Amino acid sequence: RLRSRGLGDVYKRQDGMYHVCVSDGMGSGKQAQAESTLVVDLLEKLLEAGFSRESALKLMNSAMVISAGEESYSTVDFATIDMYTGELELAKTGAAPSFIKSGKKVSVIENESLPAGVDVWQESKHSKNTLQSGDFLVMVTDGVLEYLHVKDRQGKLMDIIAGVKSDNAGVMAQEILDRVLLDTGGYAMDDMTVVAIGIWEK
């Protein structure tokens, strides 16, 4: 079973694969929201049309490049989870690090790359991991890290994630966001999205 909570989109396919997408438009306000919505909607339609994940990501990037005259750039964090094997593949395009929580242990997944829409030839950076029953994947947008008032922001966020005791994905995502907001006085300075996905054996 997969449990997800946050402002990302989850697509379930008939072959037992789950796709989770978190996108953050560059800038802020309505324009940034429109860019990230375009990315998520386009990827969903391409997957529903039968395109592979790799083809969908390339077509999405090309579409963003075409509209780049309007400076349309977005980060894309795209996770694919095989619900039979627990295999996780992350494709990052300019996206913030993601984290795997296994009990009290937290590991980081990061791949530096440009956001979607910059170069028609660019490709997402891929990484593979295997999730065990009880593990959580935590995906965030840049804003979650940027406003932590410490030198080692990534380490601080890892400590926050490790400190969450709930095994409910929704509670976990909210607790992480609430803790980060303590550093901003409760005000979201930028898009601050947290998505938590838990994996459990039936």
Where are each of the predicted segments found?
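Catalytic core of PPM/PP2C metal-dependent serine/threonine phosphatase domains
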Residues: Q33-G103, L177, L181-M192, A196-I197
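A short acidic-Thr-Gly-centered motif at the start of a beta-strand
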Residues: Y11-D15, A79-M83, K128-T130
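DG-centered beta-turn motif at the end of beta-strands
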Residues: D24, A95, V140-G143, D191
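Cytosolic ligand/metal-binding cores
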Residues: Y18, V22-S23, K30
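Single conserved hydrophobic/aromatic residue that forms the stacking wall/gate
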Residues: R1-L7, Y11
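Active-site-proximal, acidic helix/loop segment immediately C-terminal to a metal-coordinating Asp/Glu
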Residues: G27-A49, L131, D135-G186
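PP2C/PPM-type serine/threonine phosphatase catalytic core
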Residues: E89-S127, L131-S133, V138-M139, E146, ...
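Short hydrophobic/glycine-rich mini-motifs in sensory/regulatory modules
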Residues: Q14-V20, S133-F136, D190
